[in-house]
């Protein structure tokens, strides 16, 4: 009996089957792409909740991102930009809607922020006159309200955020990444948002415990 055959023999004399396990199937590329392209859906129950989301977005940014904001009047687009500014380290109190001047720039934070409002833009010539495309290079973070009025000029790799009314104070928010860089940003944003949510719940429980009456 050869040594190789003895290796395959059990102590009871039965041969051990020489089984080759199949390699684990990889997730199809189409399914991976579908997962990446699926929007991240949230519900904001209040203005502070929307502001907190904006702060997390600001902290997740690395520079050069374009954030396109969509939604009707009063949906919370400017409030979200205030949170982004605060997350970048700028004062949210200085952030106002640039409806009439089109562009506000903020450079007090760790990254420069360009806040753009295209509500009054009606033609391609008006869009070109804003100098919008000049902000899409370098480290400037660009947040664009009413981005649907300038789609032709927007970079293909960006973060799209759609806000819609849900009730009197609550909002439905959908966040979608449209390219490689924005996919990385969105993944980082979701991780930070989960951590922030856990920290917020812990701090809320601690506050409730402090307020709870002591039993005698």
Q: What is the predicted function of each stretch?
A:
Residues 67-69:
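Hydrophobic anchor at the beta1->P-loop junction of P-loop NTPases
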């Amino acid at each position: 009996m050869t040594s190789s055959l003895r290796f395959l023999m059990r102590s009871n004399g039965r041969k051990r089957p020489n089984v080759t396990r199949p390699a684990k199937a990889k997730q199809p590329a189409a399914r991976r792409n579908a997962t990446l392209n699926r929007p991240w859906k949230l519900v904001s129950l209040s203005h502070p909740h929307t502001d907190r989301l904006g702060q997390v977005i600001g902290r997740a940014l690395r520079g050069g991102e374009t954030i396109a904001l969509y939604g009707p009047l009063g949906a919370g687009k400017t409030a979200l930009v205030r949170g982004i500014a605060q997350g970048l380290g700028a004062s949210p109190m200085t952030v106002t809607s640039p409806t009439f001047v089109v562009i506000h720039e903020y450079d007090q934070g760790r990254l420069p922020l360009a806040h753009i409002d295209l509500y009054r833009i009606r033609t391609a010539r008006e869009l070109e006159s804003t100098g919008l495309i000049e902000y899409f290079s370098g480290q400037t973070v660009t947040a664009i309200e009413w981005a649907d009025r300038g789609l032709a000029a927007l970079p293909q790799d960006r973060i799209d955020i759609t806000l819609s009314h849900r009730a009197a104070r609550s909002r439905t928010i959908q966040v979608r990444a449209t390219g490689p860089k924005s996919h990385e940003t969105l993944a980082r944003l979701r991780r930070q948002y989960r951590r922030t949510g856990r920290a917020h719940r812990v701090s809320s429980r601690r506050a409730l415990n402090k307020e709870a009456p002591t039993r005698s």
